[in-house]
Every structure is written in structure tokens, then in C-alpha cells.
């Protein structure tokens, strides 16, 4: 009898353990299912060409995929399906812009992509998106459009990052894909020589073209990686812009998507890893800081100025609550009648569109050249005009006027006497008139001549860090904490 009771109890225990194990195995699946249900709010059809999956409890990142009905259509669909699930799991809202190629020109394609990015930014508050974290991605010809939008779109329609998969960059492959209609080749002074191998890459702009991740296959016989993706990476790296390059030994133009091979799996892992590790700088709550200036702001002579120039170091010093942007352009003057006026530059238009809360305006070094200073009667007027334009922005920024650092050598006819005795008094006068604060770099940087490059005009990376230190200390506490 005792043996029977023991057997019955053992069966009960085994049954209980079986149920327990089964329930434990179901819990993770149930939890994952609930997580997916919580993440996706709904699938939204925005118009006949645009639809998206909006993610609840998202960090605000969104990606727009550009898809076209050409010979790559099957590969595009496979790539989107492979990435869509992982994007949603990361809390990324995902949009797809579908369009036809027949009868279209590239201007129409880029315009529609720009309008889509602007739509997402305009709808950011109601769709719970971060307007400063909108990316664009494209495969093949879609990569061409994504790259062009990244390089040439106005600030409000330009993405914050791009994902380019075996992108068409060269004119040669554009012709092969029948897309060269209505395209004007870039001028001969572009970043790359104007042969057809570097067509889109020649439009890359220092500090202004957003960071990119390029995914290429070495055995792509449809789009030659050297003339296309590698050319774009070379232009980005040559301009000191942030860019990542992934090259797979095999996979073909479709990355093995059609065969479901190892390249496809590695590609998905690399895309997810890049997105997870991408540093987010700006949010709608960030204090936006615009650094406006010439080559000293730009970081001329400093390799990877996007990381080592003074604006980048200033970003690190100020911290996460700030979004510091470099709008420096080499050789530019404050004088509108100078040889290269800053106000004619895309960087000036971008700085205004950035709508900063704080501006560090540092111009005047190139104005001291005799060929420019002969127009000195316009310096005060032109500086007042710049300050007035900045202060009239919707954010009503606090404008700091930084004096030029000393010219330790008279390289390129730059005259430190003119800077100290003529330009700086005008800067101080304008500061009093417009209630701006002065950052006296000329005085405070004077002891650091050893932190200059051989030309005596441009700081080294260490000198740029010292500039950032001086500027950070001079930003008033109320401006830093507002």
C-alpha cells in the first residue's frame, strides 16, 4: 500500500514539474509577444506612396527606406523585410517610400524623398519622433537618392544619418540604370575630380553632410564598389565627416538575400549594431549651440576635425544636454565685400535653420588681409547684420562674439595688428550695441603659441581643445543651465 502511495505521489510531482517547465517555457514567448504588441502602435498609410510602422515607447528614432520599382525590387523587399522586425524591436519607427522610376528624373525622386523627411519632422510631436534623429536608407538606386538627399537637401529636409546598401554613386552606373536624365555635373572644384566615378561623392560637404554607414560586397558586379560606395566613403573621410564602411567578401549585389546565406545574417547584425551604438546628440530638449566661423572653427589641418575640432571638444565638455554643431568654413570673411563672404555659404543657411539657443560667432581673421581690410568701412555694418539676423531667430539665441585668436605668424597676409587694433574694437562696439557677450580668445589664447600648427594661424588638436576650454568657461552659467 505504501509503495502505491509513493508511486501516486511521484506521478503527481512529475506532472507538477512538467506543468511548471511548460509554463516557464511559455512565459518568455508570452512576454515577447506582449512586448511586440506594446511596441507597434499601428501601421499607418500616409499617402499612396508612403506608409509606416509607428512604434510606441520609442526613443524617437525613425528611418525612411527609399524603394523603387526597378530590377532591384525583389532585393529591396527582402532587405526591408529582414530589417523591419529588428528596427521595431529597437524602438525605431520605420517608413517606406515606394515610387516608380519609369518616366521620372532624379530631381523628382530626390524632391519626394526630401518632402518625406520634412513631413516626418513636421509631424514629430504627434508621431512621437525625434526630429533630430531621422535617417534614410536605400539599396542600389535608392542609395543614390539617399546619398543625394544627404548631400544637397536643405537643412530641414536633410536626414541626420544614412544607411547605404551597395549604393549607386557614380555617373557610369547611373547611366547603366537609366537615371542620368536632368542631372547637372558638379563643378571642377568639387571634392573629388569630376570624372563619372565620383559623381554623388563630389557633393559631400564638410560638417554638413550627415554621418553614414555603407554596406558593400566585394563581388558586386552590378555596382562596382570602388567607383561607388568606396568613393563616397573616401569623400566623407577626406572631409573629416563621420562614416562607417562594411565590406563583405561575398554576397553579390543582393547581399545573399535571395539565397539566405551567411552574408545576409552578418549584414543584419552589423546594421543593428551600428544603430545601437550610434551616439544621439540632439533631442527637442537639447540646448542647441551653433559654432560659426572660419577655418579655425572648421578645424583646418586637424585630422578628423568632426571629433577633434573645438566644437566637437566643446560638445564633450558641455555634455548630453547640449547639441553643438560646427558651421565653420575655411577662408571665409565676415565682410560681405571680402573675397569669400561667410554669409554666402550653405553653412550660414544651415546655422540659421538649426535655430540655435546659443551662438559662438568667431570671424575676422581673414578680414585682416590687406585685400579684404580695404573694405573695412563695412565691417561694423556687416557684423551688426549678422547679429540682428541671429537674434531674430525663433529661439532668440544668446550671441557670444569671440575675438580671433592671435595670428602668431603673418601667413597668407593675415595681420595680427589689424586684428588687435582695428577689428577687436569694432567687435566690442557691436557687443555693446546688441547686448552680446565677448569671449576674448585673442587675450586668453595668447600664452599658447606652442599649440599652433606650423602656419601660426591654425591651432593643433591640442590648441582646439584649449579653445573649447576657454569658450566653455566663458559661457555664462544661466545660459548653460537654461
Could you say what each language-model-derived stretch is?
Residues 75-77, 83, 96-131, 257-265:
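Catalytic nucleophile-loop/oxyanion-hole region of alpha/beta-hydrolase
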Residues 161, 169-176, 191-230:
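The feature captures the conserved acid-bearing segment of alpha/beta-hydrolase catalytic domains
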Residues 32-60:
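N-terminal cap/lid segment of alpha/beta-hydrolase-fold proteins
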Residues 115-179, 196:
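Primarily recognizes the serine-hydrolase "nucleophile elbow" in alpha/beta-hydrolase
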Residues 362-366, 389-421:
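Active-site segments of SGNH/GDSL-like serine hydrolases
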Residues 252-258, 302, 405-482:
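Catalytic His-Asp segment of secreted/periplasmic serine-dependent ester chemistry enzymes
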